[in-house]
């Protein structure tokens, strides 16, 4: 079944509500100041990205913008966009992903409450880092993207 853009936007907002957004570093795009909206819109290809819905930021100014068709991030050097329909896996960056399924010494791994990046692998096995504030904001982004990915399957 083909989902409409309005349906996807409403689902993204619904899931964000479930995670208690907005927070200090996670926002609904429509609630942002006009200057911030304009800055972000100038960073993206609105035709391909769809409607911007959610913005996740870090105190160090990296950001991830969740749109109706793409997720876009910037580390202040480069901007990366990925079609939500192309997401294959979302993985933690806190430890070596080759160790998944094997015993891990938890003393060497950063606590989940300190995680602030996720690794999104696309269908072509390309890998990109996406940003959110540590802890709850990151897990909100992760779960919102998992749901969005399912909407496009």
Segments (PLM) and residue ranges:
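Canonical pleckstrin homology
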Residues: 98-141
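Nucleotide-binding motor/catalytic cores of P-loop/tubulin-like NTPases across gene-expression machines
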Residues: 12-16, 88-89, 115-117
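Phosphoinositide-binding peripheral membrane targeting modules
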Residues: 52-105
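Anionic N-terminal interaction surfaces
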Residues: 1-64, 121-122, 126-133, 139-140, ...
């Amino acid at each position: 079944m083909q989902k409409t853009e309005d349906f996807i936007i409403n689902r993204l907002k619904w899931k964000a509500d479930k995670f208690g957004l907005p927070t200090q570093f996670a926002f609904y795009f429509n609630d942002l100041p006009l200057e911030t909206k304009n800055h972000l819109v100038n960073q993206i290809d609105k035709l391909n990205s769809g409607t911007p819905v959610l913005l996740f930021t870090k105190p160090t100014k990296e950001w991830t913008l969740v749109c109706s068709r793409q997720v876009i991030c910037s580390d202040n050097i480069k901007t990366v966009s990925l079609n939500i329909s192309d997401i294959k896996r979302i993985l933690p960056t806190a430890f070596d992903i080759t160790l998944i399924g094997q015993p891990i010494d938890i003393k060497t791994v950063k606590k989940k409450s300190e995680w602030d990046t996720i690794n999104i692998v696309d269908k072509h096995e390309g890998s990109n880092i996406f940003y959110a504030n540590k802890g709850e904001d990151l897990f909100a982004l992760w779960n919102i993207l998992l749901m969005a990915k399912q909407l496009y399957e």
